[in-house]
Swiss-Prot record:
A single GO molecular function term of this UniProt record: amino acid binding
Top-level EC class as recorded in UniProt: transferase
Pfam families in the record: OTCace, OTCace_N
UniProt cross-references to InterPro entries, sorted A to Z: Asp/Orn_carbamoyltranf_P-bd (IPR006132), Asp/Orn_carbamoylTrfase (IPR006130), Asp/Orn_carbamoylTrfase_sf (IPR036901), Asp_carbamoyltransf (IPR002082), Asp_carbamoyltransf_Asp/Orn-bd (IPR006131)
NCBIfam families: asp_carb_tr (TIGR00670), PRK00856.1 (NF002032)
Subunit structure: Heterododecamer (2C3:3R2) of six catalytic PyrB chains organized as two trimers (C3), and six regulatory PyrI chains organized as three dimers (R2).
Assigned protein family: Belongs to the aspartate/ornithine carbamoyltransferase superfamily. ATCase family.
Name the record gives this protein: Aspartate carbamoyltransferase catalytic subunit
Ligand binding (carbamoyl phosphate): R65, T66, R115, H143, Q146, G271, P272
Pathway recorded for this protein: Pyrimidine metabolism; UMP biosynthesis via de novo pathway; (S)-dihydroorotate from bicarbonate: step 2/3
Highest classification ranks of the organism: Bacteria, Pseudomonadati, Pseudomonadota, Alphaproteobacteria, Hyphomicrobiales
Source species of the chain: Bartonella bacilliformis (strain ATCC 35685 / KC583 / Herrer 020/F12,63)
One GO process term, biological-process aspect: amino acid metabolic process
């Protein structure tokens, strides 16, 4: 895609999940994001494409990393960015999500970014508000922007995604990141594995097109990418693991089991990392770790999504301007 060639139109008003996106949809967003990385690596970080537009970040779950990334992405595009502080809002006083949506709609925003602890919250909001909605994570359902930044990290680091073996390891059961990544990586042509104890795997996970392994030794064999997930203890209501120490020994990533992956494999983690729980410090800080690269790619991806949703060629009435 050259600088003077327009990107294909992204044919969706909202980004509510990876499910339902085509290979062309994903490629369009990744190509846009790749162009953004190239620009700001040349210190050309600011654009004015969203000048005069309003972006509202509505986070019902705390996430310094994701919220800061969306805020910086909006500002780099020239948008006016407002962060809603939920602890000080009417929601804490009993206002429903629909009431909040109605109130925000009256402010005439152009983009609303929502993170919520309930699956489907972003979809509900999209039905009640006139602007574009971006899902920044809804319960254990989906986290589409994380999957896109992970795909961009892999593509820029390895040169491709198609044909690579990606091992996603850890708490698959409670992870929206795992769900979105499985869908996106399968669509992009990767071979996806999940590695976890049976207690941390959802029923029917095989139906998502993944190979299932219950030991790191088997699951990491020949892996090009190893993606670790944290234990989401806040979503657990029972005894899913015997102990943290035993979990780390069997399912954490450390030098004793990393030897089974390819020598040039890359290590990824959506953050925040729990050192000594799902990953050893020397691995997280090692030369194969892409954790900080993922953060960098996140800004470029979120810029690309907002650019695509507010592309002036859209009219959202089935025609293109």
């Amino acid at each position: 895609m050259t600088q003077n060639t327009p990107f294909p139109i992204f044919p969706h008003r909202h980004l509510l999940g990876i499910k339902g996106l085509t290979l062309q949809d994903l490629t369009t967003l990744l190509d846009r994001a790749d162009a953004n990385v190239t620009l700001y690596q040349k210190n050309d970080k600011k654009k004015s494409i969203l000048h005069g537009r309003t972006q509202i970040n509505l986070f019902f779950e705390s996430s310094t990393r994701t919220q800061s990334s969306f805020e910086l992405a909006g500002k780099r595009l020239g948008a006016d960015v407002m962060n809603m502080i939920i602890s000080n809002s009417s929601v804490k006083k009993g206002e429903t999500l629909i009431d909040t949506a109605t109130t925000l709609n009256a402010m005439n925003p152009d983009i609303l970014v929502i993170r919520h602890n309930c699956a489907g919250a972003a979809s509900l909001l999209a039905q009640k508000i006139d602007c574009c909605v971006i899902n920044a994570g809804d319960g254990a359902h989906e986290h589409p922007t994380q999957a896109l930044l992970d795909a961009l990290t892999i593509r820029r680091t390895k040169g491709r995604i198609e044909g690579l073996t990606v091992a996603i390891c850890g708490d698959i059961l409670h992870s929206r990141v795992a769900r979105s990544n499985i869908i996106s990586l399968n669509t992009l042509g990767a071979r996806v594995r999940v590695v976890a104890p049976s207690t941390l795997l959802p029923t029917g996970i095989e139906d998502m097109g993944v190979e299932v392994f219950h030991t790191m030794q088997e699951g990491l064999k020949g892996a090009d990418v190893v993606m670790m997930l944290r234990l989401q203890l806040e979503r657990m209501t029972g005894a899913f693991i015997p102990s943290i120490r035993e979990y780390f020994y069997h399912f954490g990533l450390h030098k004793e089991n990393l030897i089974y992956a390819k020598n040039d494999c890359i290590i990824m983690h959506p953050g925040p990392i729990n050192r000594g729980v799902e990953i050893a410090s020397d691995i997280a800080d090692g030369t194969r770790s892409m954790i900080h690269t993922q953060v960098e790619m996140g800004i470029a991806v979120r810029m690309a999504i907002m650019e695509a949703l507010l592309d002036p060629r859209h009219d959202y009435n089935g025609e293109k301007k």
